[in-house]
Amino acid sequence: MTQDPGVFPPPSDFPEYNPDDMSGAAVFTKRPDLQGDRSPGLIDLRRYMFQLGMSGFQTFVGAPIALTPADLTAAGVEVAMIGAGLDFSYGMRGSAFGPQMVRNGEIYLPPGYGTPNQHTRVDPITELVLADYGDAPVNNQSIYASIEPIRALVREVAETGAIPFIVGGDHSLMYPNVAAMADVYGQGNVGVIHFDAHYDATDAGLGLNLTHGAPVRRLIEQGHASGHNFIQVGTRGWAPNDADLGWMRDHGFRYHNMPQVDKFGWDWVMERSIEEAADGTEYLYISIDMDVFDPAFAPGTGSPEPNGLTPREMFPILRRLGAEKNVVGVELVELNPLVDSTRATAIVANRVIREILTGIAMRKKGITDPYYFAPEAIDGGQGQDWPPPQ
């Protein structure tokens, strides 16, 4: 077929799918033996009562695994971790290995059991019922073939009442993840706070509707979320352009970019962001792109951008969101271990997970003070009279 280079999509005689190749369906088909006689519940892969991080089978935060919704329900799981190794929607491959990067990053952290957060003295690993729900089904040849299976798995978790915590994978995952939240909680009922160096609402994707730079626009265009309830934090660099910025403002976006941080300070931005998160909605979804961090702290990401946030700035707001808001879903995306031989990004990513879980555990314990510090964490060992009056 003669192809006109000015036509998009280009015409082709080559069929996209082979209906006789059963491997395509197998990627998304659950094992029939999972429906057998096993009593539902969590499966702990540790043989011993205490196991160091570098030993055994690596799971998210060392959690036991679950394979079915019945497992989640029987155990009363409150947060279910899901890997989603999708990296087909941007130019630099590698974020498909993000979930394993995070699981393996556990070897550089304390085992978690009996090791509380130092600011709050709350241990989310023992306070919450956690599970590693394995990985979402992904066709690594097609983002479009992967969207609905990922959405279905995230919805499956949310329908049990557990919080799905998705680790990617690139940021195109935001589309199926937030769409799944809308499926369960209703369109427009879930606010999104989006930490990212980039606004991810472009309409330009080489002719493709969904890339890692477009999920926000697609979610709003299709009614899964509203612009007014999209709060963006940490954006910087050379985008959006005038047209995209105009679209965002027309749709009521509230954004807190690095120019705002430079002008008013991080504390002001943090307070505004928390105040606006879930303003007018009952539920909150947290989206963290690792490139929101300055690449000095998290170099292992696909689209690094200088002048980012520091872990010291990010961790308090993540704890507070978990403690103060009704979080129903979380995603951590754009981790690329192929461009970080130091594993520093994995360490920061694991701390991001633990800080959010700490906030959720604080809420469960009834600790919602926005400025909470455990007394013994800040008294310097000096008792109640510390610190001295200013």
Regions found by a protein language model. Give the residues of each.
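Conserved alpha-helical scaffold segments that buttress catalytic/binding sites
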Residues: 2-390
